């Protein structure tokens, strides 16, 4: 599927559009979708205690559809959601070689989790997608809102595996009303999310669009390595299809490489407190009601998530010098208020806006009747889903652009083209800095003046990704490949690109400046899939509140928080209700950052659905099993050791003289008081060299402390003792660890 520009890693630009399709502007009649290639009928059954006890496997190469049983071992050790996905993928890949992302054996796995699909508990509508990433060549997971995972479960399946490569473009339809799975030829269906979802909802949903949820990507995923998955749901209040994204790691690129235009699930049944088959309905009602009342009372006083969503973070990050500006060179800018909560308070459509039924946090948000200024839909008024903080910071401030309408337009086209806004923003910012440093020029960029702040050029990059032409697909290869291309084609200095290229493990950084937080450097660098904040977000605890001054305290938090956050992905939950709204007396508790009152509530929630009583320690243990298994999975893929936990120096300290001097008082003070270095009569360059030495040494010490706390050896590999303790010492796991012992 990917064009030859990407396959060869060449900079040869296509002369014309690769994906030119008249159907972008002309409607496709739904009757063209009816040639069934494969079909599988099944009995519907009933969800019991959060499970169907079976998963669905679709082999596109052989057009074979099968059902697999879920055994008790799988539930006990992998719980559901991300855990199920990882276990299924682990067993699908060849044992005699390392599979690549575009090998037919690779899968796109999607699961919900036992708690997912509960309407009375906030944040219970998440799906988790897992695959081998085109960016990292290792396993990647992505947590996403919407109705798909819940509908998949209510249609009879705890997880979905899509394996193999179809010979022609296809649509997968899972009919949870009739108990039927079909693979159909896609014919002339467009790739663009907003077009294909509308067509498929009309075909399969008929007069009930709310019964349909669609997973799709877009043409940008066909021409880049960071294609996202769009998960749709129907907004009854606005009478429109809405979207959330499984953005990180390029799973959308994998889906399009398999020639899958869309996966559709249908469920027309009523969603009630009993639909998920809970073990204790009354406890579930009680714990859900308590949480919802707390959110309705306290959210207006705290972050106003139900009004401004995550946009409130822009002002906070800017205030604490944590907002990425100009490729993470700086942490604040006087123009940041033009991207902040008060701007989006006015722009967001009013009224309840949640991505799951019954979620009182309701933080989805979108912009109604936004008139597009560029691209194939110029002049059209559209509904834009978002933007959220990561998009605002990524395609906005990090590219030196402080224009809210521009960010909204970028958000829209990234969704339509199926592109991860975080990777788009961070990769574009890297290309901009390379351009300003003279490492590449206009000839390299096919005529684009790629300066920071040039919003027209940034938008054109995205349109080129959608069309598969120009410099856009080069940026779409991601920072790691761009560094290689710029060095080989243009003689760019590799050392400076290594320092300023904000990627680790091949994945672009999400949007927080980490220079002054050693713990967050570890949160990014030690994250399993690469530098994504959903695993460990410790900046405030470390930098602002100074609650972990020692390496041991940092290591403890870099153990506990990733473990607890992992638990959300095992169960089909959103993390935001846990700590974006907190009890009124939370500050008086022993460890307020952990919000133990809410964790105890999650334990009750787990019991109410599954019937299994658990403690906080049990929750951490559940996550530890899956977390360590994923680390070992990376080892199987040829990664997962100490060297792969490296991060670029800009994540650690100032790369340029300009960066140092923007915080000169802070850095001079640290050199003198923390490291005992005499700054008198020293040049900026000398001080930068000294600071780098000290900070890089600290990061290595942090690795040692975290590895020890997690039960890993000095090379970052889980020990045999650790996996035996976690009861994941499967024969192939033990054999793999012995090779790296």
How should these model regions be labeled?
Residues 5, 15-17:
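Polybasic, lysine-rich low-complexity intrinsically disordered segments
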Residues 20-21, 26:
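Intrinsically disordered, low-complexity proline-rich regions
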Residues 32-252, 257-272, 278-300, 314-324, ...:
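Protein-protein interaction/assembly regions in multi-subunit complexes
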């Amino acid at each position: 599927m990917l064009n030859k520009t990407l396959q060869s890693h060449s900079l040869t630009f296509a002369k014309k559009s690769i994906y030119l399709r008249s159907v972008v502007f002309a409607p496709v009649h739904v009757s063209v979708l009816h040639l069934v290639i494969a079909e599988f009928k099944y009995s519907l059954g009933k969800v019991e205690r959060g499970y169907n006890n079976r998963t669905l496997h679709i082999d596109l190469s052989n057009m074979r559809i099968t059902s697999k049983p879920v055994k008790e071992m799988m539930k006990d050790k992998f719980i559901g959601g991300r855990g199920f996905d990882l276990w299924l993928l682990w067993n699908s890949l060849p044992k005699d070689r390392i599979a690549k992302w575009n090998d037919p054996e690779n899968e796109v796995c999607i699961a919900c989790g036992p708690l997912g699909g509960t309407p009375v508990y906030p944040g219970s509508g998440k799906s988790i997608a897992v695959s081998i990433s085109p960016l990292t060549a290792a396993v990647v997971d992505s947590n996403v809102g919407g109705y798909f995972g819940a509908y998949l479960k209510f249609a009879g399946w705890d997880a979905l595996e899509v394996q193999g490569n179809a010979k022609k473009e296809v649509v997968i339809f899972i009919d949870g009303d009739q108990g039927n799975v079909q693979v159909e030829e896609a014919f002339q269906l467009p790739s663009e999310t907003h077009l294909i979802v509308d067509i498929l909802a009309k075909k399969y949903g008929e007069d009930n669009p709310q019964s349909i949820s669609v997973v799709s990507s877009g043409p940008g995923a066909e021409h880049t390595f960071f294609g996202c998955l769009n998960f749709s749901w129907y907004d009854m209040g606005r009478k429109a299809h809405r979207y959330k994204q499984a953005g990180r790691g390029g799973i959308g690129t994998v889906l399009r490489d398999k020639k899958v235009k869309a996966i559709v699930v249908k469920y027309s049944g009523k969603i009630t407190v009993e639909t998920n088959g809970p073990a204790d309905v009354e406890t579930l009602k009680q714990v859900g009601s308590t949480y919802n009342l707390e959110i309705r009372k306290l959210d207006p006083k705290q972050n106003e998530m139900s009004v401004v969503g995550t946009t409130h973070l822009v002002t906070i990050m800017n205030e604490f010098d944590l907002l990425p500006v100009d490729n993470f060179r700086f942490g604040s800018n006087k123009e940041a208020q033009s991207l902040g909560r008060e701007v989006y308070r006015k722009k967001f459509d009013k009224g309840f806006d949640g991505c799951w039924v019954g979620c009182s946090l309701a933080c989805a948000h979108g912009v109604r009747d936004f008139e597009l200024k560029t691209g194939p839909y110029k002049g059209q008024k559209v509904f834009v889903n978002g933007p959220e903080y990561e998009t605002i910071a990524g395609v906005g401030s990090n590219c030196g652009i402080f224009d809210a309408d521009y960010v909204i337009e970028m958000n829209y086209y990234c969704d339509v083209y199926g592109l991860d806004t975080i990777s788009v923003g961070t990769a574009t910012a890297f290309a901009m800095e390379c351009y300003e440093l003279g490492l590449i020029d206009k000839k390299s960029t096919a005529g684009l003046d790629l300066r920071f702040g040039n919003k027209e050029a940034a938008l054109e990059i995205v349109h080129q990704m959608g069309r598969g032409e120009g410099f856009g697909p080069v940026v779409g290869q991601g920072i790691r490949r761009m560094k290689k291309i710029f060095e080989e084609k243009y003689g760019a200095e590799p050392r400076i690109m290594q320092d300023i290229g904000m990627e680790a493990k091949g994945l672009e950084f999400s949007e927080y400046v980490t220079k002054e937080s050693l713990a967050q450097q570890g949160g990014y660098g030690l994250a399993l899939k690469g530098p994504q904040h959903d695993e460990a977000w410790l900046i405030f605890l470390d930098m602002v509140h100074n609650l972990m001054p020692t390496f041991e305290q940092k290591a403890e938090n870099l153990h506990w928080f990733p473990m607890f956050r992992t638990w959300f992905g095992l169960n089909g939950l959103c993390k935001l209700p846990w700590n974006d709204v907190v009890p009124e007396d939370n500050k008086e508790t022993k460890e307020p950052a952990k919000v133990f009152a809410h964790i105890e509530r999650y334990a009750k929630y787990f019991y109410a659905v599954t019937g299994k009583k658990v403690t906080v320690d049990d929750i951490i243990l559940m996550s530890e099993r899956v977390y360590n298994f994923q680390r070992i999975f990376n080892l199987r893929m040829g990664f997962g050791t100490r060297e792969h936990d490296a991060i670029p120096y800009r994540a650690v300290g100032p790369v340029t003289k300009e960066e140092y001097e923007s915080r000169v008082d802070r850095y001079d003070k640290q050199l003198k008081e923390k490291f005992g270095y005499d700054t008198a009569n020293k040049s900026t360059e000398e001080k930068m060299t000294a600071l780098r030495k000290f900070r890089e040494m600290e990061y290595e010490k942090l690795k040692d402390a975290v590895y020890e706390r997690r039960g890993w050896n000095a090379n970052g590999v889980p020990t045999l003792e650790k996996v035996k303790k976690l009861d994941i010492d499967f024969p192939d796991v033990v054999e793999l660890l012995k090779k790296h012992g």
